[in-house]
Amino acid sequence: MQLFHLCLIISCTCPTVQASKLCLGWLWGMDIDPYKEFGATVELLSFLPSDFFPSVRDLLDTASALYREALESPEHCSPHHTALRQAILCWGELMTLATWVGNNLEDPASRDLVVNYVNTNMGLKIRQLLWFRISYLTFGRETVLEYLVSFGVWIRTPPAYRPPNAPILSTLPETTVVRRRDRGRSPRRRTPSPRRRRSQSPRRRRSQSRESQC
């Protein structure tokens, strides 16, 4: 890790260094949480295991298949579209930088160290970031946050007291719909009150008409 940072800050002279420093600031340990603006935190994402997140290639293919038109559009669609664009560009800059550093390191061991560090540490953070942006756009804020909280509660509960399977994000919208239907039952019980109001409305109209006639 120290070798990689040393190559970036001191020895590296490629033109993408400054851009990479800016876009990778939070990856280098700065106190920047890219999820706070959207109601989540790095700690909340950390409850999800590393093997939960798809590969960067699969996430990029998913983003392209679902939101390519919006991502390539010059117009501002939403803060999450902008954040997704930045994450994709950030990964591209990181790959360019890692390739440059790897090609300029003569020691094979140092080269492997750079590649492994990028794939394990920085790659995981990019996978988390891409997954969060895509899930937010696909399922919505409330569903994603509810899933993160539900998974966090599940993973921290002892195995003897929790369900065998972890929560699934794609099933939460169905649960949300059921809850909304349950909440919608209360107005149905109050249906007599509108009927009474309707029955009273003609009387009021008649009284008003009599007063107008007078």
UniProtKB/Swiss-Prot annotation:
Stretch list, region 3 X 8 AA repeats of S-P-R-R-R-R-S-Q: 186-208
GO cellular component: extracellular region; host cell; host cell cytoplasm; host cell nucleus; T=4 icosahedral viral capsid
Keyword Signal: yes
UniProt record, GO biological process: microtubule-dependent intracellular transport of viral material towards nucleus; symbiont entry into host cell; viral penetration into host nucleus
Keyword Signal: yes
Annotated site, Cleavage, chain positions: R185, S186
Positions annotated as propeptide: 186-214
Key words, A-Z: Disulfide bond, Host nucleus, Host-virus interaction, Repeat, Secreted, Signal, Viral immunoevasion
Matching Pfam families: Hep_core_N, Hepatitis_core
Major site of localization recorded for this protein: secreted
Residue ranges of Sequence repeats: 186-192, 193-200, 201-208
UniProt subcellular location: Secreted; Host nucleus
Residue segments, region HBEAG: 25-27
Modifications the protein undergoes after translation, according to the UniProt entry: Phosphorylated. Cleaved by host furin.
UniProt function note: May regulate immune response to the intracellular capsid in acting as a T-cell tolerogen, by having an immunoregulatory effect which prevents destruction of infected cells by cytotoxic T-cells. This immune regulation may predispose to chronicity during perinatal infections and prevent severe liver injury during adult infections.
Family (UniProt): Belongs to the orthohepadnavirus precore antigen family.
Record text on subunit structure and interactions: Homodimerizes.
Protein name per the record: External core antigen
Organismal lineage: Viruses, Riboviria, Pararnavirae, Artverviricota, Revtraviricetes
